[in-house]
Structures are given as structure tokens and as C-alpha cells.
From Swiss-Prot:
Name under which the protein is recorded: Putative disease resistance protein At1g59780
Entry's family note: Belongs to the disease resistance NB-LRR family.
GO molecular function, one term: ADP binding
InterPro entries: Apaf_helical (IPR042197), LRR_dom_sf (IPR032675), LRR_R13L4/SHOC2-like (IPR055414), NB-ARC (IPR002182), P-loop_NTPase (IPR027417), RX-like_CC (IPR038005), Rx_N (IPR041118), WH-like_DNA-bd_sf (IPR036388)
Domain comment, as recorded: The LRR repeats probably act as specificity determinant of pathogen recognition.
Length: 906
């Protein structure tokens, strides 16, 4: 039986995407209109066969072959079309500028049409049926719009059904039992071990009991240095990006743990030998450090209390499934649950083997389907798998569980399948930055901001992540400050399923072992269009990669090692995505051949060792994302090439340039994120036209800057949400601050109305900034660092800062008195008061802020310390705060920490 809920395949999504490209750009195909029209008609006919072909691919090898050929045809056609459009944009009236001109392109398109006709003939001979369609993209577009209209529950989806009672018990074991080394949570994959550990880690009692907390995911192939470095960075943020030798890391960890109480979580340890490799970092238990382990295996740590979560009872399974699959009851007026659907759901739940992850995934799959017919198809598929596959009723048999996981993938719309397969390209337990991921998806054409009025690439990615979280396929939570999903992870079982699907679809190739058959030297013959490299040791400076069809190349070093790249990109002509984070280049020069990659839409050189960028970068006119936050410790030669990159949405510039020519950025009208915009290297007036900016980091220099001009520019940025103003490292304002800074902030009307985050560093304001800032009604984060204000008195008035969530006051050397009136900052959650040397007391008004959950205080002033300590005369003002940290965060090792973005405080 054809599985109607599975027809939105990866192949059909690719065909739809190509058809959409041809339709949207039709007017630009001058001279080849006839061939383009024929190709569109052929694609429409082809789409009609895909539903039946996809339904038969599991049992018919020839059907699978047809789908693979269609995928290759789609890729080849897209390459031809994009070359035409890119070359044609240089000279709209003439195609003589690229080989063969119109005639060659026409022949290539005709060849594609012939290949489509041939594969259609083969499918007809195989008995694959055609569906009548009104429009090639009608099904997928309607499905996508329906999915995105679906209302997502605002409740936490941690769904600790059956585990709630254990959280308090294990928290007490960690904070109340001084004799134990910690807790080891063991059991099957998908049992909820990590979910339980996270609930414990985030518990208020745990946060207030321990001086420091660290969380590290331990993959099957880990290095001890990387694990130790992650822990050290968690416990002492100043070492987060350091490159210390392993012995030094061990020594510093040993010293920290000798004197501080710390809880360290090791998530997903595989065997006891792994623990013994890591253990030398721990001193004998003096200060009270403890560990919390999760593992599929028992007896990982010989001295930990072992806790084994039980499988859910059948009643708990049903309760959990109801919470997810029937969530529409709460959100859709008049929604009625069919009794037959309830009966089927109960029966399907039995095949989840009482495993929480399987129940959640089944619930997410059912929740996305609205009709009895769709639910019957899912039920029949599960039952047929059990009958045909001979799945046993043994609860240790994972076959039916894996089938539920596989079904949850197959039930996704095609665009979400692409998204999920991309997530699988990252290493096990890897935390994926969603902002960067959103641009990778956009570069591959997965996201369609144009379909959603006013939406950005990041907005659409957030919608997609929300869908995957709702279906319990991705682990992520919205950030309390940004209301976005900032990072995400794949559950390891779901990742295993996705890797199998990626292999079936020839979606990507992962290189991990330099000695394997999948090494870099075999890439020229690879049919995969996407390559991910974990083991960067396979590269030497002489290696040049060759693959004429490769679209995406990601380097994700496991650990912190750098790698050398070759000098030639010419053999990778069709790349859309190139991630070179941490790469080293001969002589510090990025090869000029980078300019040959005219299809490139995503380029990252974050932390790369580069001192010279070639002028050929100007050829990369299709770039959406360009990250040049290079870590060379030297001045960087940055040519004036950005003015031609009109599609840019994200631009991160180096900290310091060696070039004297100003960068012209005024043409970048589509920019949404601009980092390290220097008033020395660029004209502030360029900002006037960047009206779509949402995030802006400005490096202030005193050379010719008029602050009125800057204020005027900022007032034009109506969509700006996140603003950081920081002095350039070599700026003259350190000697003569008044050459740059005005004594007060501009009036409220000069600030962007949507501003949610503002960070001021070394601004030397003489007038209290709070009366202005508290009137910015969208502000959620305010950071005043290092003499941002140099006055004696600061006042937060009642009713001010209505949505403020986080306030950081760091290094205001002159501040003596701070008044917080009752009713000010009613939603404040986190407050940091750090190194304000003359501050006499904490504000009395803090006792009225019932929302305050975290207070960090660091000072060397003995009198102040005594006042705020437990039992001190000021303690009553803060005793209602669940988590109070003293002498935290630690002092940055040097001023470089100040300039991290968006915040130096972890």
C-alpha cells in the first residue's frame, strides 16, 4: 500500500526547488526561453511519478535507481541554471562571456530534458504510476504552510514522565551526601538519562551548593585533552579559548578542584576505561567535587551511586503519548479526538518497548498528522514491519524501536528531511550553533525566507528547528533573552538513523580516518555532493582537493587542532558552502583561487591563521554569510571588496586591518548582522542604508569620528535588536576619551525602537545612563563594562526597565551609590556586580525584585564583602535570591576577553 504520509521525499523537494528557481528567474533566460519552458514542463511531469516511486523504493531496487538518477539530474540542472544566471548577471545582454554562449547552454538544458524523458520512460516500464497534479509545488507548499501554521505548545517538552520523583532524590545525593563521589545514571539509549541529568544540573539547589559547574559530552572517540579543556573552560571562562598543553590543563584543573566545590557532568561515557583515562585530573576529595555520569553501561565509576531509570510503565507511555500526540486539543477550538484514533495510538505505543524517546518520536509523528486515514497508514506500516520482520515481543529487541525512529524521519516534509540530514553531519553530541546552521541551510536552498512575509533566514531556520523540537527529533530550548533557539543537538539514536538515511540517499560523506577508503584522496570519484571532515590530520599544506560536483565542504575538527589547506580551490568549482574554521595557509595568504568559487554562498574563516585576503574575493557575489573573525594576532590585509557582495546577510570583519583604504559597505542593503564595524576603517554614514540590521557591533575609533553622526545612523536602524559599542584596541580614546565620547547618551528617540540588548564598554559617560536606558521598552539585556559610566551615583526609577532580564555592572570604578526604586526592573532574572571598587552597598530596592534568581558579586573590598555575606547587614536585601555566587565570575586573564561578542561573562 502506498504510504501517503511519506510522499514528500528528499528527491521531490529537490525537483520542486529547481522548478521554483526556473519560475522565479524566467525573465532572465533570454535566448533560451524555449528550452527553459520545455524543462519546466518535463519537471512537472516528473513530479507526478515521484510519489509512487518513493513508495516503492524500499522493495524495488530499480525504483531506487530511478530516484538516484533523478537526484543527479536535478543537481546537474541546478548547476547549469545557476552558472547561466551568475554569468548572465555580469552582462545581461550577452552570454558571450562564458564558454559556448547561448548555444552551449541551450544544448545542456536540452540534454537534461532528454535525461528526464528517459527516466520517465523507465519508470513507466516498471509500472510506476503517475499522479495528476494541478501544480508542481502545490503539495509541498500546502504541507509546509500547514506545518508552520501549527501551534506549538509553550510547555517544556522535557516530559519527565516516570522520572520526576527521582530528580529530588539524586539532587540530595549530590548536595547532601559528602561521602559519595557522585551519581552514575545508566541504562538503554533513549531512556532519558541525559534529560534527567540536565534537570539535576539546572536545579537551584545544585547551582547554589557548588562553586562551579561543568558539562562535557564524551563521544566514543574522544581525546583526553579536549575533555579536560572543555571542563576547564566551564569552570574558569578565561581559559575557554586558550591553547594550553595537556599537562598545563591538568595542573590547572587539579588546582581548581583542590579548593572549590564543583559538579562535573560526563554525558554518554561508554566504558570504564574511558573514565580511567579522564580521572587523573581529579585530586583526592578535599573541597567536595562530585561527578554526575550518564552511560549505557553499568559500573563506569566504582565509587559512584548507580541509578538505573526504569522503563516506562504502559500507563506512563500512554500518558506521555497523549501529552504530545493530542496537544491540538489545547490549541485548536473544536478539535475532537476520534475514538478509533485513540485505540490505534494505544496499540502503536506498545511497539515503543516502553522507551521514552520512541514514545516521544511516535507522538511527534502522530501530532503532525490530522486524519484517521493518515494514522491508519502509520499503524499499518508498524504492524507490517513486525509481521514481515519477525520482531519479537522481547523488550530488549530494538528492531521495532528503530522502525519507529525511522518512521518519524520518513514522516517529515522533504525540506525538514534535508535539515535533519545536515544536522547528522556534525559529530556525536556536538552542540550546533543555529545561526550558522541557518545560513548553511540557506546556501543549499533549504530555507525560503521569501515564503514568509518579513521573515529573515534566521527566522525561517527558527521555525524549522521548532518543528523538529516539537517532533522530539532535536534537542533544544529557546533562549530566555533572545526567544530563539541558539544551539541544538541530535539524540545519538536519532543521529544513527539519520546517518543511515544519509547513506541511502548518498546525501553526504564523512571523513574520519585518514587510512580508510573514504579518505580525501578518494573524493574525486565520490558521487556525494557534501563532504564533512572530522580528522583534519589528513591534510598537508600540499594537498589540493578535487571534486567537480562537490557543493558543501565542512571542516569540523574533533578537538582544537588546526589544519593546513592547499593552495588551489579551482578543482571545487560548484561549492556553495565552505567552512574553513581553524585552517592554516602557506605564508598566511588565502589563495586567490578562492575567487573562482562563484557559486559560494557561505564562507567561514573563523579562527583561521590568515594575514592576507586576496582581492579576488570580490568575485563571490552570491555570498550570504561571510565570517572573517580571523585569529592571527596580527593586522589583516582586507581589500575593499565587499561593496559588490549585494546578497550578504551576515558579515563579521577582522578586529584590526593593515589596509589603509576604507571599506565601502553602504551597498550592503540586505545585511542583518554586522560584527566589528570599525569607525576607522569604514564610514559611519554607510550604516544609514543598512535598515535591515538586527545585530551590530561597533569598534569605536577617535580618528575623525563625530558621535552625532553615529547617533543619527543608529536612529535609522529600526530593526536593530542587539548593539555593542566597544573601543578599537589601538584607539586614542584610552588617552583622550573626550575626543570621541559625548558625556551623555543620546535621547531615547535616537535609539532603535526594537533594541533588546545593549553593551557599552569604555564609554566614559559622565551622566547617569539609566534614565535613558530604562525608557527603552524592549531592552532585555544591559551591560555596562569598564568605565562605561564614570559618575558617582546611579538611579533606576520605579517603573523603569519593564522587560529587563539581565543586568551586568562590571568595573565602574567611580560608582559609589546605586539606588533601585521599588517597581524598577520587575522581571530581572540575573544581576552581576563585579569590581565596582567604590560601591558602598547593594541597592535596598533589590529586595523588591521577586523575579531575581541569580546574583553574582565579586569585590576585593573587605567591608563590602562582609555586608553581603550571609549574616551581614545587607544580606536581607538579597536573601530571597535562590542562587548567589561570591567572587564570581573570575577575573579575565587579559583585556582580550572584554572584546568577545556578545558578552565576556559566561
Amino acid at each position: 500500500m502506498q504510504d501517503l504520509y511519506m510522499v514528500d521525499s528528499i528527491v521531490s523537494f529537490g525537483v520542486e526547488k529547481l522548478w521554483k528557481l526556473l519560475s522565479q528567474e524566467y525573465e532572465r533566460f533570454q535566448g533560451v526561453e524555449e528550452q527553459i519552458t520545455e524543462l519546466r514542463d518535463d519537471l512537472k511531469m516528473l513530479m507526478a511519478f515521484l510519489s509512487d516511486a518513493d513508495a516503492k523504493k524500499q522493495t524495488r531496487a530499480l525504483a531506487r535507481n530511478c530516484l538516484e538518477e533523478i537526484k543527479e539530474i536535478t543537481y546537474d540542472a541546478e548547476d547549469i541554471i545557476e552558472i547561466f544566471l551568475l554569468k548572465g548577471s555580469v552582462n545581461m545582454r550577452s552570454l558571450a562571456c562564458f564558454p559556448g554562449g547561448r548555444r552551449e547552454i541551450a544544448l545542456q538544458i536540452t540534454s537534461i530534458s532528454k535525461r528526464i524523458s528517459k527516466v520517465i520512460q523507465v519508470m513507466q516500464n516498471l509500472g510506476i504510476k503517475s499522479d495528476i497534479m494541478d501544480g508542481v509545488d502545490s503539495h509541498a507548499q500546502l504541507e509546509r504552510k500547514r506545518e508552520l501554521r501549527h501551534t506549538f505548545s509553550s510547555e517544556s517538552e522535557s516530559n519527565l514522565v516516570g522520572l520526576e520523583k527521582n530528580v529530588e532524590k539524586l539532587v540530595e545525593e549530590l548536595v547532601g551526601n559528602d561521602s559519595s563521589h557522585g551519581v552514575s545514571i545508566t541504562g538503554l539509549g533513549g531512556l532519558g538519562k541525559t534529560t534527567l541529568a540536565r534537570q539535576i544540573f539546572d536545579h537551584d539547589k545544585v547551582k547554589s551548593h557548588f562553586d562551579g559547574l561543568a558539562w562535557v559530552c564524551v563521544s566514543q572517540e574522544f581525546t583526553r585533552k579536549d575533555v579536560w579543556k572543555t571542563i576547564l573552560g566551564n569552570l574558569s571562562p578565561k581559559y575557554k579559548d586558550s591553547d594550553l598543553p595537556e599537562d598545563d590543563i591538568q595542573k590547572k584543573l587539579f588546582q581548581l578542584l583542590e579548593t572549590k566545590k564543583a559538579l562535573i557532568v560526563f554525558d554518554d561515557l561508554w566504558k570504564r576505561e574511558d573514565w580511567y583515562r579522564i580521572a587523573p585530573m581529579f585530586p583526592e576529595r578535599k573541597a567536595g567535587w562530585k561527578v554526575l555520569l550518564t552511560s549505557r553501561n553499568d559500573a563506569i565509576h566504582p565509587h559512584c551511586v548507580t541509578f538505573k531509570p526504569e522503563l516506562l510503565t504502559h500507563d506512563e507511555c500512554w500518558k506521555l503519548l497523549q501529552r504530545i500526540a493530542f496537544s491540538k486539543q489545547k490549541t485548536i477550538t473544536g478539535y475532537i479526538i476520534d475514538k478509533e484514533m485513540v485505540k490505534m495510538a494505544k496499540e502503536m505505543t506498545k511497539h515503543c518497548k516502553r522507551l521514552p524517546l520512541a514514545v516521544k518520536l511516535l507522538g511527534g509523528l502522530l501530532d503532525a498528522k490530522h486524519t484517521l486515514r493518515q494514522w491508519k497508514l502509520i499503524s499499518e506500516n508498524i504492524i507490517s514491519h513486525i509481521v514481515v520482520g519477525g520482531t519479537s515481543s522481547n523488550e530488549n529487541d530494538s528492531s521495532s524501536v528503530n522502525h519507529v525512529l525511522s518512521l518519524s524521519f520518513e514522516g517529515l516534509p522533504g525540506y525538514l528531511k534535508h535539515c535533519l540530514l545536515y544536522l547528522a553531519s556534525y559529530p556525536e553530541d556536538h552542540e550546533i550553533e543555529i545561526e550558522r546552521l541557518s545560513y548553511v541551510w540557506a546556501a543549499e536552498g533549504i530555507t525560503y525566507p521569501g515564503n514568509y512575509e518579513g521573515a529573515t533566514i534566521r527566522d525561517v531556520a527558527d521555525l524549522y528547528i521548532e518543528e523538529l523540537v516539537k517532533r522530539n527529533m532535536v534537542i533544544s530550548e529557546r533562549d530566555a533573552l533572545t526567544s530563539r533557539f541558539e544551539k541544538c543537538q541530535l539524540h545519538d539514536l536519532m543521529r544513527e538513523i539519520c546517518l543511515l538515511k544519509a547513506k541511502e540517499e548518498n546525501f553526504l560523506q564523512i571523513v574520519t580516518d585518514p587510512t580508510s577508503s573514504s579518505s580525501v584522496h578518494s573524493l574525486a570519484s565520490s558521487r556525494s555532493r557534501r563532504l564533512v571532515v572530522y580528522n583534519t590530520s589528513i591534510f598537508s599544506g600540499e594537498n589540493d582537493m578535487k571534486n567537480s560536483k562537490l557543493r558543501s565542504l565542512l571542516f569540523i575538527p574533533v578537538g582544537y587542532s588546526r589544519f593546513s589547506m592547499g593552495s588551489n580551490f579551482i578543482e571545487l568549482p560548484l561549492l556553495r558552502v565552505l567552512d574553513l574554521d581553524g585552517a592554516k595557509f602557506k605564508g598566511g595568504k588565502l589563495p586567490s583561487s578562492i575567487g573562482k568559487l562563484i557559486h559560494l554562498k557561505y564562507l567561514s574563516l573563523y579562527q583561521a591563521s590568515v594575514t592576507y585576503l586576496p582581492s579576488s574575493l570580490r568575485n563571490l557575489k552570491s555570498l550570504l554569510y561571510l565570517n572573517l573573525r580571523i585569529n592571527s594576532g596580527q593586522l589583516i590585509n582586507v581589500p575593499n571588496v565587499f561593496k559588490e557582495m549585494l546578497e550578504l546577510r551576515y558579515l563579521s570583519l577582522p578586529w584590526e586591518r593593515s589596509s589603509l583604504t576604507k571599506l565601502e559597505l553602504g551597498n550592503l542593503l540586505k545585511l542583518e548582522t554586522l560584527i566589528n564595524f570599525s569607525t576607522k576603517d569604514s564610514s559611519v554614514t554607510d550604516l544609514h542604508r543598512m535598515t535591515k540590521l538586527r545585530t551590530l557591533q561597533i569598534l569605536i575609533s577617535g580618528e575623525g569620528l563625530h558621535m552625532e553622526t553615529l547617533s543619527s545612523a543608529l536612529s535609522m536602524l529600526g530593526h536593530l535588536e542587539d548593539l555593542t559599542v566597544t573601543p578599537s584596541e589601538n584607539s586614542v580614546q584610552f588617552k583622550h576619551p573626550k575626543l570621541i565620547y559625548r558625556p551623555m547618551l543620546p535621547d531615547v528617540q535616537h535609539f532603535p525602537s526594537h533594541l533588546t540588548t545593549i553593551s557599552l564598554v569604555y564609554c566614559f559617560l559622565e551622566e547617569d545612563p539609566m534614565p535613558t536606558l530604562e525608557k527603552l521598552l524592549q531592552l532585555k539585556v544591559v551591560s555596562l563594562w569598564y568605565n562605561a559610566y564614570v559618575g558617582r551615583r546611579m538611579v533606576c526609577t520605579g517603573g523603569g526597565f519593564p522587560p529587563l532580564h539581565r543586568l551586568e555592572i562590571w568595573g565602574l570604578d567611580a560608582l559609589e551609590e546605586w539606588i533601585v526604586e521599588e517597581g524598577s526592573m520587575p522581571l530581572l532574572h540575573t544581576l552581576h556586580i563585579v569590581d565596582c571598587k567604590k560601591l558602598k552597598e547593594i541597592p535596598d530596592g533589590l529586595r523588591f525584585i521577586s523575579s531575581l534568581k541569580e546574583l553574582a558579586i565579586r569585590t576585593n573590598e573587605k567591608v563590602f564583602q562582609k555586608k553581603v555575606s550571609k549574616g551581614g547587614e545587607d544580606y536581607y536585601k538579597m536573601q530571597h535570591v535562590p542562587l548567589i555566587r561570591y567572587n564570581w565570575p573570575q577575573e579575565p586573564e587579559n583585556n582580550e576577553v572584554i572584546y568577545s561578542f556578545p558578552s565576556p561573562i559566561i
